[in-house]
């Protein structure tokens, strides 16, 4: 970890020598790090990946990120009644400035660094380039999910085109899916010794695990499209016939997180304590949505006490209805995030949960898209979630429940299998992979019954964000027109 941390510091110094203020100058931003090499840049790129998931706006310390807004719109995260920290999100007030840093910094920080690796001209870096392709696909898919059409084919010209055209969202999805296949092929054909384990802060240079990660991302992308009517049977078949398999443990990144300023795990930076031991603003604000907390309480879910700690005022675990700013739900009367989420400032940063992989497989098997026993995969997903959060009793929780969103036999007898899978995925990833459970809610409508916040500006929950003001200012000729209802109209191709 110390070696990776040193590599990151060196790489950041190289990249920061001539950073540009032009945020979407992936075509020209961060200059051309001609003195750097993929082995130096990879750990810095992986650190940037972690930041995009949990702390994309580090300079302003806002905590804006894909996963935080996802947790809010999935009905998981709420705001303490005396903090008013997430009020615009809970009101469904979505402007061109809303969470704009997740667009801007995904391009300038994350995609730029991976693109540098992917296009590096010297020989001997095949596995680095394959990893870069996989991670570019990971982030670009999130941009498509969030915004629809995005710059892709012209987005990486290194200064030759600072106003890139927008590509059709489905065409981008198809292109990055193919890039995942190309990355797998590159790994299969890479000469031995083309990657040093100490320079890979995610999977320690285990290229078989990188192939599994790519295959699991492919499954995620295919299930996104399950309602489109597209004929994807051949792609599902290839997922199995390639013999790669799927991830069976959480994919995490840890470049050497430490309890020092600017070196903490970004999730902990946002929701935990400062290096001096003081609660952050988000720590004092972040609470469970009442609907989420009550579901766990009603089902005697052992994960409850890992996700939350008792309220300071009376020792009860209590959530808060979203957008409810009253004294009854002040911060000391509601439950902060618990030890299953906030371990310490050096904890690994989850990129993709092992439980998500199992729930993806359970859904695909239930739909008859891949072989496998959905019941077994579902129960394994619950067990993995318990393990990820440090809880025990997964088997009894599922088997003894009278709730058909928990007990598989009851779900099967009532035709509720899909909602059970998505609901358990929602619990497992609600605070960790908030973006994924938001997209699942858009795609499936599950979990059912999540209330629209009182005072929200729309009777339906958001599906998308708007193109940033900065993009409209610098690339207006190419930015697609968006209607007044664009944040709610399910305009990404797979949502329609």
Spans of model-derived segments:
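Terminal processing/anchoring signals of secreted or surface-associated proteins
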Residues: 1, 19-22, 137, 176, ...
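Bacterial Sec-dependent N-terminal signal peptides
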Residues: 1-28
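Residue-level signal for alpha-helical transmembrane segments in multi-pass membrane proteins
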Residues: 12-16, 53, 429
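Membrane-proximal, proline-rich intrinsically disordered regions
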Residues: 19-76, 122, 236, 337, ...
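Structured, solvent-exposed acidic/aromatic patches
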Residues: 35-39, 80-392, 411-418
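Short coil/turn segments at secondary-structure boundaries
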Residues: 57-66, 307-310, 393-394, 433-443
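C-terminal functional modules
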Residues: 386-496
């Amino acid at each position: 970890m110390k070696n990776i941390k040193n590599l990151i510091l060196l790489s950041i110094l190289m990249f920061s020598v001539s950073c540009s203020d032009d945020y979407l100058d992936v075509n020209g931003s961060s200059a051309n790090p001609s003195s750097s090499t993929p082995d130096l840049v990879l750990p810095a790129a992986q650190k940037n990946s972690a930041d995009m998931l949990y702390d994309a706006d580090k300079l302003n310390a806002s905590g804006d990120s894909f996963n935080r807004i996802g947790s809010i719109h999935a009905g998981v995260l709420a705001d303490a009644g005396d903090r008013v920290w997430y009020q615009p999100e809970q009101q469904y007030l979505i402007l061109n400035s809303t969470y704009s840093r997740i667009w801007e910094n995904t391009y300038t920080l994350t995609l730029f660094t991976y693109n540098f690796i992917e296009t590096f001209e010297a020989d001997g870096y095949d596995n680095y380039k394959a990893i870069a392709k996989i991670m570019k696909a990971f982030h670009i898919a999130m941009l498509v999910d969030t915004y629809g059409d995005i710059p892709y084919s012209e987005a990486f010209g290194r200064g030759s085109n600072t106003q890139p055209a927008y590509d059709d969202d489905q065409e981008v999805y198809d292109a990055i899916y193919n890039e995942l296949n190309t990355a797998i092929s590159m790994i299969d054909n890479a000469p031995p010794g083309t990657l040093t384990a100490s320079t890979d802060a995610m999977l320690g240079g285990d290229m078989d695990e990188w192939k599994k990660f790519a295959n699991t991302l492919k499954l995620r992308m295919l299930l996104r499209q399950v309602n489109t009517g597209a004929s994807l049977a051949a792609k599902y078949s290839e997922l199995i016939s390639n013999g790669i398999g799927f991830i069976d443990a959480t994919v995490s990144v840890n470049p050497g997180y430490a309890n020092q300023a600017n070196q903490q795990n970004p999730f902990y930076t946002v929701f935990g304590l400062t290096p001096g031991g003081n609660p952050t603003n988000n720590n004092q604000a972040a609470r469970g949505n009442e609907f989420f907390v009550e579901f766990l309480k009603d089902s005697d879910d052992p994960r409850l006490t890992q996700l939350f700690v008792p309220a300071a005022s009376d020792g009860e675990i209590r959530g808060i209805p979203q957008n409810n700013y009253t004294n009854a739900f002040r911060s000391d009367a509601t439950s902060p995030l618990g030890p299953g989420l906030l371990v310490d400032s050096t904890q690994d940063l989850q990129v993709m949960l092992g439980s998500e992989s199992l729930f993806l497989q359970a859904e695909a098997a239930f739909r008859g898209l891949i072989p496998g026993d959905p019941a077994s995969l579902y129960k394994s997903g619950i067990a993995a979630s318990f393990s990820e959060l440090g809880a025990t009793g997964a088997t009894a929780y599922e088997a003894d429940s009278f709730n058909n969103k928990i007990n598989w036999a009851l779900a099967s007898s009532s035709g509720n299998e899909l909602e059970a899978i998505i609901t358990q995925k929602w619990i497992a990833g609600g605070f960790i992979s908030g973006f994924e459970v938001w997209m699942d809610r858009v795609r499936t409508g599950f979990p059912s019954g999540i209330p629209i916040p009182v005072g929200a500006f729309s009777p339906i929950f958001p599906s998308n964000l708007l193109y940033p003001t900065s993009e409209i200012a610098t690339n207006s000729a190419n930015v697609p027109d968006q209607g007044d209802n664009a944040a709610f109209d399910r305009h990404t191709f797979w949502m329609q």
